Amino acid sequence: MRTISLIVLIAGISMLMLISLKTQAQTPTDGFAMSKGEICLVTDYGQTTWKEYWEGTRLRENLNLGTFQSNMIMPMAGYGLNNRLNLFAELPYICTSSTAGQMTGMKGWQDLSLSAKYKLIKKKNDQGTFYTFLTAGVSFPVSNYIPDFLPYSIGLGAKTLSGRVILHYEHKTKLFATFQTGYTLKSNIETDRQSYYNEGQVNSNEMPVPDVWDGAFLLGFNNIRFRVDMHYNWSTSTSGSDIRPNDAPYPFNKMDAQWIGVSGLLWIPGVKGLALHASADQVIAGRNVGKAFTWTAGVQYVFNPFKKSAQ
């Protein structure tokens, strides 16, 4: 028997197997923005591992699977089209494996995500500054991977359309708080199976993938040298079925998760725009997902090739 992998959508774009890979670079889901002409280049490496998983709401192990592991490299690019609108592109490469059993993991390029973040409101007073951002995004597979081979699949194979609202407040003491939430629509997919379970047998090879509502709360500190935060995230499928006892998972399963974590960013002295960032997250509650621990680390470089040097 196979178990379910941790498949949680962050931030409104398709990030399967690895949670909370949105570290402290400028991203579509945070409360920070690039100025006009700025380019942000990011490369992240991350790893997720889990041994226990929720079969429905029951937490259990599977000795035939052992410890499941997913590794990911994700390049990302961001561009400040103007002082209000930022554009982003991301494409993760994922490799999956387990320590027991006879199943072979999968690897490859997953889904290309394209998104835009718009600064709708900026209000400043003597105590701090309040921002409201709106984010919209799409994603689609770029390789012919198999989605119905969980937990080893590198993705669910669905095209997505997402929208998000971000509320961000920065106090004059450099403390900040962020709340963001979004909804992701997912397309149906075609599988090799001829039927699946949805409160009864459905005789079709076309399978719906549940939409997702997700969000996060962050509290942190940000200055010109470094940034740190602690966060709580959730992701909830709006439909789907539970993994049945002694049955294999599939993309229509209802996948819910809550996780907590910390992350940070350090600007490198002497190299303008260069920073290192890292994060660590632990799933604390779930449904049809792995009880996973995820860590990530990466490097980012922010520069403006169009800005004229001061005379």
Which functions belong to the PLM regions below?
Residues 29-37, 84, 122-131, 173-174, ...:
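Short loop/turn motifs that connect adjacent beta-strands in outer-membrane beta-barrel proteins
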Residues 47-72, 148-153:
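Surface-exposed strand-loop-strand hairpins of Gram-negative outer-membrane beta-barrel proteins
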Residues 36-42, 86, 90, 109-113, ...:
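Outer-membrane beta-barrel architecture
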Residues 45-51, 91-97, 120, 138-144, ...:
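Transmembrane beta-strands of outer-membrane beta-barrel pores
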Residues 43, 75-79, 89, 114-118, ...:
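Residues on the lipid-exposed face of transmembrane beta-strands in outer-membrane beta-barrel proteins
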Residues 54-63, 201-311:
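Outer membrane beta-barrel transmembrane domains
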Residues 37, 69-73, 107-114, 130, ...:
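Residues that define the transmembrane beta-barrel architecture of outer-membrane proteins
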Residues 102-207, 249:
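Outer-membrane pore/translocation modules
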